[in-house]
Amino acid sequence: MQTRKTLSWIKEEITRSISLSLMLSIITHASLSNAYPIFAQQGYENPREATGRIVCANCHLANKPVDIEVPQTVLPDTVFEAVVRIPYDMQIKQVLANGKKGALNVGAVLILPEGFELAPPDRISPEMKEKIGNLPFQSYRPTQKNILVIGPVPGQKYSEIAFPILSPNPETNKDVHFLKYPIYVGGNRGRGQIYPDGSKSNNTVSNATAAGIVSKIIRKERGGYEITIADASNGRQVVDIIPPGPELLVSEGESLKVDQPLTSNPNVGGFGQGDAEIVLQDPLRVQGLLFFLTSVLLAQIFLVLKKKQFEKVQLSEMNF
């Protein structure tokens, strides 16, 4: 009887452990797959502040380049590509959340003019579909279809991201006009240094929170350190927790100042933003321009023909 109860208890514990592991796996996977966009989406109504700064820069502190390429002009109700390039050295590795080294991911936010939006699948050409692949584009908000986000996605494969964009038609959307519009882009590579709640990730420098002497350094079993700093003037002790990943720069017995770096800076990524301009062109204006150019060309041809005819008449009169 006792053996049966023991087996039943073991079975329950195993089932509970498996369920807990599955839940943690799902939560962790969701957190990793949505990390870049979801932080901004949850914390900010608009990813671009009034100053022009894109909010991703609040968490990704290093400044890195980003580039965007769009056509100079587009016609209404047409699909075009907005190509975002996020360059970085493919050989470098970043510090992951567990302290190990891994490849960099990239992410981007594309802020289009009102009326522009992600092109529906049935409007995208086969060539463009092949270039885009299976990238999971999404709107920043269900009501903000002109703001698109992507990431994190593997940087080695997607350091260049092509957004398929559908231009609006002023005939059906009265809020849109044939004008020149700005487009804003932000792109990051690698993990951030600050979480939305203000806490630091393990992808940045850890600084001393107090001045004093390093009295003890304990290396934690799962990585990272506990550094005890003793203030000689009052005997107070402060323990700074160093997450796994960064390289320790201090040793026991060393004198520290407040905010002195305790670790190296492991960050190899960063964020950048840029802009471009695009003209929504009126087809009638294009037709008018073509008609004008054709008229000028025909006038020039007739002028040349008339001149040659006049020269022939002059030549015949001289011969006569």
Swiss-Prot record:
It is found in: Plastid, Chloroplast thylakoid membrane. Binds 1 heme group covalently. One of its GO terms (molecular function) is iron ion binding. The chain crosses the membrane at residues 286-306. It is a single-pass membrane protein. GO terms for cellular component: chloroplast thylakoid membrane. It comes from the Eukaryota. Its cofactor is heme. PROSITE patterns: CYTF. Heme binds at residues 36, 56, 59-60. Keywords: Chloroplast, Electron transport, Heme, Iron, Membrane, Metal-binding, Photosynthesis, Plastid, Signal, Thylakoid, Transmembrane, Transmembrane helix, Transport. Pfam families: Apocytochr_F_C, Apocytochr_F_N. Residues 1-35 form the signal peptide. GO terms for biological process: photosynthesis. The 4 large subunits of the cytochrome b6-f complex are cytochrome b6, subunit IV (17 kDa polypeptide, petD), cytochrome f and the Rieske protein, while the 4 small subunits are PetG, PetL, PetM and PetN. The complex functions as a dimer. Component of the cytochrome b6-f complex, which mediates electron transfer between photosystem II (PSII) and photosystem I (PSI), cyclic electron flow around PSI, and state transitions. Belongs to the cytochrome f family. This is Cytochrome f. It comes from Pelargonium hortorum (Common geranium). The gene is petA-A.
